[in-house]
Amino acid sequence: MPPLPTSILGRTGLNVTKLGYGAMELRGVDHFPRLSQAQASAILNGVLDGGINYIDTSPDYGYSEQIIGEQLAHRRAEYYLASKCGCPIEDPEVPHEQRKPHDFSRANVRAGVEQSLRRMRTDYLDVVQFHVSPARSTLEQEDSVAELLALKDEGKVRFIGMSGTIPELADHIAMGCFDVFQIPYSLVEREHEALIHQAAMAGAGIVIRGGVSRGVMVKDESVIDEYPPFLQPAFRARRQRWQTTNIDDLLDGASPMEFMLRFTISNPDMSTTIVGTANPAHLAANVAVAQKGPLPADVYAEACRRFPVD
């Protein structure tokens, strides 16, 4: 099979596949089923066997980190591993709505990174990102960045990043300290596009999340009810936007999911887009789509015209 296209993750210099793997669906809580050992092995080894070399997770994702450690520690040299910090130190079983608030104190940042290292059975993380887009003032008051940089000096973290969104994202970029930004972006969610470009021009690597919006645009609306309540409003808004905009003439035989993924890969500023699934068949389909590369330039431009930035 043809190799996946790759890109340099900004100033990190890491050569990452343009299709990455988002491991949230391994969480095993919050409406996500707990995978058996066989299921976990199939999906995670399938990720690496399919050529993907970038895996993103978080302590907030239930059992995700633990499962990655169990299944992939023996293949650690084959992939780049990204996680988050500032997350509450909790048992994986605690549901989202019962978890403690995020805490960006130096002590909690360090405790979280060290917990991630233990869970994933590794002595370093390639990228650690602050989760849930904390305000710049919070990071400065807590001296949070200094703690991540200390962990970097110790060799436990290679590069630091921000999982950021509007309205804080512009401030995060202006701080000038982040090697990587993880930002939501898709055909139906383009409001961060200018900031993505700004961050890329400043030399940061760009990790896209939500590039296919979990396929909620084309599924029965009742499927959205199966997701945690905190995800549902955004999913409904994206589905509504998709349903009211006709692009059938642009699909050229592709499924909407395929088109969405190739649209995301077509953004010239992106380094990798993380797509999650616990289904090996869906994983294989995602790999096959990514192998096709970006959309033709004229199709990409027309899709942008039909889904303008609000």
Q: What are these model-predicted stretches?
A:
Residues L9, Y21, V47, I55, ...:
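Conserved, mostly hydrophobic/aromatic
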Residues M24-L26, S58-D60, K84-P88, F130-S133, ...:
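Active-site beta-loop-alpha junctions enriched in small/polar residues
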Residues N45, P92-L187, A194, S266:
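Glycine/proline-rich, positively charged
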Residues N53-P59, R158-G161, V180-I183, T272-I274:
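Short catalytic-loop micro-motif centered on adjacent basic/acidic residues
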Residues A77, A174-Q182, A200-I206, D269-M270:
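Glycine-enriched alpha-helix->loop->beta-strand junction motifs that scaffold or abut catalytic
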Residues E78-L81, F178-S186, K292-Y300:
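Short hydrophobic/aromatic-enriched beta-strand-loop microsegments
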